[in-house]
Regions:
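Generic detector of short, locally flexible boundary/turn motifs and exposed helical patches
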Residues: 14-15, 53-59, 78-80, 174-183, ...
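N-terminal alpha-helical "arm" segments
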Residues: 1-29
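Glycine-rich, mobile lid/loop segments that gate access to catalytic sites or pores
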Residues: 121-170
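Assembly/oligomerization interface modules of large self-assembling protein complexes
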Residues: 27-87
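Short, surface-exposed, charged/polar-biased interaction segments
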Residues: 32, 47, 112, 127, ...
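Long, contiguous amphipathic alpha-helices that act as assembly "spine/axial" helices in icosahedral shell
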Residues: 78-136, 213-216, 313-315
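Short active-site-adjacent helix-start/loop capping segments
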Residues: 57-63, 99-101, 306, 318
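Sequence/fold signature of self-assembling virion shell proteins
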Residues: 2-8, 149-205, 209-214, 220-338
Length: 338
C-alpha cells in the first residue's frame, strides 16, 4: 500500500475494508453466549427500554362436573429499565504517516479501531457477572453503573424476594449466591445444582422444577477451566476410584469461558475474581441487551480534517443492558468468603 500517492477516497475504501475485517475477527463471547436476549431498538423511539417478567401458575386446578374452569393467575414480576449509552473512539492518520509510507502503523491503528466498540460491549456485559455481588460500580469513564436487578438487590444474593413490582406476588425468597463461595469442584457443583432444585421459584412461590440450566461459566483461570473440562468431558467419574465409572456431568453443560471476567471496572486484571464461576439457563434468561446503533465507521468526509492535516476516522455504537431477575443464574466467588 503506497500511502504517499493514495487519494483520500481510495484510502477510505481500504480503511473500511480493514476496519470490517478487524471487527469480524472478534468472538464477541458475551454477546454470543446466549445469556442475553438481544433487541434491535428502532430509531426515534427513546433512549430507554423497560423489561419485566410475567408468570402463570405452574399447576392446573381441579374442575368438578359442571363447574367452570378456574382461570390461571397471572403475576407481574419485577421491572428493569435499561438506558442507552453511546461509545466512541477516534484515530488520526497523520500526514507524516501518509507521506512517509508508514503502512504498518496505519494498519495497526485501523485494526485497533475495528475492535474498540465491540470490546467495550463485551466488557460491559461481562461486568454483569464480575460485579454481580455488588449493587453498583464506577466504570472506566467515571460513570456509576447500576448492577442491581429489578428488586434493587445485587444479581447474586442470598434472599431475593418474589413479591414483584406491584407487590402482588409471593413472600417466598430464594438465593442464587452459593453459600460460603466455594471453588469449582464436584461437591460445589452439586451444591449449586441444589440451588436449582430447591431455590428456583416463580412469582406465585411455586417451585420451577424443570427449569433447564445448560451453561457452566468460568473465567480463564487455568485450574478452574481444566477442572470444568474434566467434569464435562471425562468418559468416567473424574473422582472415581475405578475405571469405567459413569460420569454424570458428561455433556450436561456447555462450558462458557469468559476472558474478561476477572477484571477491574477499567478492564485491568483483578486476581480477587479469578475463581468466579456459576451455572445459567439460556432459555430462561432475564438479561437483556438493546442495540440502539450497530457499530459503524466514520470517515474524514464525516469527521472532517483539521489544521494538523490528519485524516480522521472514528468508531461509534450505542447500546444498553440490564437484568430483570437472578432466577436464571447461580454463582460463587470461589474465594471461600462467607
Amino acid at each position: 500500500m503506497e500511502l504517499n500517492t493514495i487519494s483520500q477516497s481510495d484510502f477510505t475504501r481500504l480503511a473500511t475494508m480493514r476496519w470490517l475485517k478487524s471487527k469480524a475477527s472478534l468472538s464477541n463471547i458475551m454477546r454470543n453466549s446466549g445469556l442475553f436476549k438481544i433487541e434491535a431498538v428502532p430509531a426515534n423511539t427513546g433512549e430507554t427500554r423497560e423489561y419485566s417478567e410475567i408468570d402463570l401458575n405452574e399447576y392446573a386446578s381441579n374442575k368438578s362436573e359442571g363447574d367452570q374452569a378456574e382461570r390461571a393467575s397471572v403475576q407481574q414480576g419485577y421491572r428493569k429499565t435499561i438506558t442507552a449509552v453511546r461509545r466512541a473512539k477516534d484515530i488520526g492518520i497523520t500526514v507524516e504517516m501518509r507521506k512517509r509510507n508508514k503502512a504498518p502503523e496505519v494498519i495497526a491503528r485501523l485494526t485497533n479501531l475495528g475492535k474498540l466498540i465491540d470490546n467495550r460491549l463485551d466488557l460491559d456485559l461481562t461486568h454483569v457477572f464480575t460485579f454481580g455481588w455488588d449493587t453498583s460500580y464506577t466504570d472506566m469513564d467515571g460513570a456509576t453503573v447500576a448492577a442491581t436487578t429489578g428488586d434493587t438487590k445485587a444479581l447474586f444474593y442470598s434472599a431475593h424476594l418474589l413479591v414483584g413490582a406491584d407487590e402482588g406476588g409471593s413472600s417466598t425468597t430464594y438465593r442464587n449466591a452459593l453459600a460460603n463461595n466455594p471453588r469449582l469442584s464436584k461437591g460445589s457443583l452439586e451444591g449449586i445444582e441444589r440451588l436449582v432444585a430447591e431455590e428456583t421459584y416463580n412469582y406465585h412461590g411455586e417451585l420451577m422444577a424443570e427449569m433447564p440450566f445448560d451453561v457452566l461459566w468460568t473465567g480463564p483461570d487455568p485450574n478452574t477451566v481444566n477442572t470444568a473440562q474434566e467434569y464435562l468431558k471425562s468418559t468416567a467419574d473424574p473422582d472415581g476410584a475405578h475405571s469405567g465409572t459413569f460420569n454424570g456431568y458428561a455433556s450436561k453443560y456447555r462450558h462458557l469461558i469468559i476472558p474478561r471476567l476477572a477484571t477491574t471496572a477499567a478492564g485491568a486484571r483483578d486476581t480477587d475474581k479469578r475463581y468466579y464461576w456459576g451455572i445459567a439457563s439460556t432459555s430462561n434468561s432475564t438479561a437483556h441487551l438493546g442495540i440502539w446503533e450497530k457499530t459503524f465507521l466514520l470517515t474524514p468526509d464525516e469527521l472532517g480534517k483539521d489544521s494538523t492535516e490528519s485524516w480522521n476516522y472514528g468508531a461509534r455504537g450505542s447500546y444498553g443492558w440490564g437484568v430483570v431477575s437472578g432466577s436464571f443464574v447461580k454463582g460463587s466467588k470461589g474465594d471461600g468468603s462467607a
